[in-house]
């Protein structure tokens, strides 16, 4: 821990928040290579798994999903597809795998603030 540079940072300096390209469940295919993420808080936001749908809508592993109705952040360790009202949180820095739980906790501390914001303003 001596090599870590400790300090205060704005989350906007560490992460970008981006829209996801979404589609409905009727587009899903057989398979379990990808998670289909929705705005739910249940099951880490995973509604179901799917096979390959298309390249355009895939969100990268190593990001977080944010369901805009419950405002819950979940780390995604494999590529994923999104339903409506989901954003992706992309780190601007390299985050070691063993630090993802820490950052998930930090991001979820924003929930009370985000719940008071209109969904259309979360960007």
Language-model segments: what does each one mean?
Residues 5, 99, 120-123:
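Amphipathic alpha-helical segments
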Residues 1, 22-26, 92, 112-117:
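Short, recurring structural edge motifs at helix starts
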Residues 9, 34-36, 75, 81, ...:
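Sequence-level detector for tyrosine residue identity
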Residues 87-90, 104-123:
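Specificity-determining recognition surfaces
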Residues 46-105:
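A short beta-sheet element
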């Amino acid at each position: 821990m001596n090599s870590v540079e400790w300090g205060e940072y704005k989350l906007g300096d560490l992460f970008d928040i981006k829209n996801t390209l979404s589609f409905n469940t009727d587009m899903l295919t057989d398979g379990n290579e990808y998670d289909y993420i929705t705005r739910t808080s249940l099951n880490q936001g995973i509604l179901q798994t799917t096979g390959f749908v298309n390249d355009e809508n895939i969100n990268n592993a190593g990001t977080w999903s944010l369901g805009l109705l419950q405002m819950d952040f979940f780390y995604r360790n494999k590529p994923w597809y999104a339903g409506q009202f989901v954003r992706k949180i992309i780190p601007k820095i390299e985050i070691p795998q063993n630090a993802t739980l820490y950052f998930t906790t930090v991001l979820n501390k924003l929930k009370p603030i985000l719940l008071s914001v209109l969904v259309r303003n979360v960007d």
